[in-house]
Amino acid sequence: MDYNFRGNHYGPRNLTRKEHKKMSNAGFSAPVNYWGAIDGLTPKSSNDGKTSSVAEAPNEYGDTAAHDVYGEVLAPSTEYAVTDEVDLADIVLGSIHSRTIGSGASAITKKIMLTTVAITTQANNPPTVTISGVEVESGATAKRTYALAGTLTPRSKAQDVCGAFTASANFTQINTNAAVDPHVQTVGGVPVASDASHGRIEVQATMTDPTGNGAITAANAGGFTVTASPAETDPDANYITRAATATKYLIGTEAE
């Protein structure tokens, strides 16, 4: 610890903000922001999701006499803290991103497709966003993309960010999952072509009835359809809760 001379004795010196930050982060890993800068989102953690394929040659007993590992690919994800308002239009399903993996002579640039956005919001907890995708061919460009709409705030409350429900009860948790199905063709385990389809948004909500009269409903809103009607739970010595799911299917836009 550093010391400053104070009057007739030495005492501990308060660290500057910069010094404190440097000490608190010493040895910590830095999350990888696979999906580029998005206003209102700060990377919190990441995972490269690497997988490989294994070819096996059995002998007459069925034992593996030889094997080889090939076709390592990424399926990366980044979890974000919400630090300001987020315009969901800044997150595009099916979009293609370039990321350099490694450094120096071993550095390699990979192309990845954004396939999934998972938003978790609930009472008394700050929201989180996780964006995931898959590796595609080295020369990939976006072919079909799917737009999102809505605003997410950093407030610690349940948020129907896509406007999926009209409800007569209090939301306590809402999870929003938007996704496309990636289609990646490989040769020898290496991606050589890709596309995306079947864009959709699924919103799962939990509601409570503070009056205890069971009048809990969820209705279609914002182009969504209630695909799982509110399922009622009647706990002992507590209020009624219901969980509902609403789904919206998206029409993609062809790249020009």
Please place each PLM-identified region on the residue numbering.
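Short, Lys/Arg-enriched N-terminal segments with co-localized hydrophobic residues
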Residues: 2-22
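Hydrophilic extracytoplasmic domains
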Residues: 236-245, 249-256
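Hydrophobic lipid-interacting interfaces of membrane-associated proteins
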Residues: 134-141, 247-253
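Short, conserved charged micro-motifs
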Residues: 85-92, 211-218
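Solvent-exposed edge beta-strands and adjacent loop segments
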Residues: 18, 23-82, 104-134, 143-211, ...
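Short, cysteine-centered beta-strand-loop-beta hairpins and adjacent loop/turn segments enriched
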Residues: 85, 139-141, 212-213, 254
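Extracellular Ig-like/FN3 beta-sandwich strand-entry sites
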Residues: 94-96, 200
